[in-house]
């Protein structure tokens, strides 16, 4: 029993050290070739996943820039997609803030999403509080409008991507309730609510696949990632009743202080991550 107890005690610091050694040295930027299903057709585009750690005030739920207050380290994911549907363009972005201490914090603290196209824009924000998820929705469109609501604690699909990178063993497995991704709910005019899903792991081509199946939505999300830490995301597939969206890893850069690369000559760096010099 003493030996087993010692192994358990040592496991957590070792994994925490791995997280700190890898993730606290600048951002990871990955570009993906996107085929986005929209309006029953597939449209070419690109996607970026930007993972970076930063100090975060767990009370105010904003970046800790003063060095005062209840600060905790989070792994932030900025997930972006860009694609055109015929003549007009779409831009989406989701920012999710997940504490690296998975034992102390059961969920992300915050997740925000914005969608812009030529018709208008929409925004929603999730804040995790003692009473569950506090949600704000703001939209140009009448059938969505402006609303505030509270949902009981449940896993966010948008936090799954970060948990997967930190420790896949912490992901929900089997039948569970998950709040689907914000982009999906907005694109498909779905109510914001926890939905029954089946979560499972599988393997293919030396990689692991984490799959979320939502029977009531007719939707499957499959994320392909490396078996070993840091569990690099290689591709994802989202299948719905109207089509399948795929994103495949193009290029990846580590230890990038992108917030400092803001001069005209730094645009050359965009080529290194597979992006055009001028954003589109």
Where are these regions (language model features)?
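Acidic, serine/threonine-rich low-complexity disordered tracts
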Residues: 17-132, 169-280
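Sec-dependent N-terminal signal peptides
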Residues: 3-12
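Surface-exposed beta-loop interaction hotspot
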Residues: 125-176
């Amino acid at each position: 029993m003493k030996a087993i107890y010692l192994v358990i005690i040592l496991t957590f610091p070792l994994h925490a050290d791995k997280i700190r050694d890898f993730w606290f040295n600048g951002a990871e930027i990955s570009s993906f070739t996107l085929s986005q299903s929209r309006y029953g057709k597939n449209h070419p585009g690109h996607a970026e996943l930007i993972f970076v750690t930063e100090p975060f005030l767990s009370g105010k739920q904003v970046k800790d820039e003063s060095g005062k207050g209840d600060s905790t380290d989070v792994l932030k994911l900025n997930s972006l997609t860009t694609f055109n549907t015929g003549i007009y363009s779409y831009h989406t972005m989701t920012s999710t803030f997940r504490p690296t201490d998975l034992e102390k914090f059961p969920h992300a603290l915050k997740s925000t999403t914005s969608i812009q196209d030529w018709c208008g824009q929409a925004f929603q924000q999730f804040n995790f509080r003692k009473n569950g998820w506090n949600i704000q929705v703001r939209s140009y469109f009448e059938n969505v409008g402006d609303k505030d609501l509270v949902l009981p604690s449940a896993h966010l699909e948008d936090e799954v991507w970060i948990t997967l990178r930190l420790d896949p063993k912490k992901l929900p497995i089997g039948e569970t309730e998950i709040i689907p991704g914000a982009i999906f709910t907005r694109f498909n005019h779905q109510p914001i609510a926890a939905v029954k899903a089946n979560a499972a792991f599988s393997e293919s081509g030396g990689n692991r696949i984490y799959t979320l199946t939502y029977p009531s939505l007719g939707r499957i999300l499959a994320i392909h990632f490396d078996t070993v830490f840091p569990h690099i995301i290689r591709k994802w597939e989202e299948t719905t009743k109207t089509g399948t969206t795929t994103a495949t890893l193009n290029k990846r850069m580590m230890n990038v202080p992108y917030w400092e690369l803001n001069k005209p000559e730094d645009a050359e760096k965009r080529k290194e991550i597979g992006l055009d010099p001028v954003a589109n």
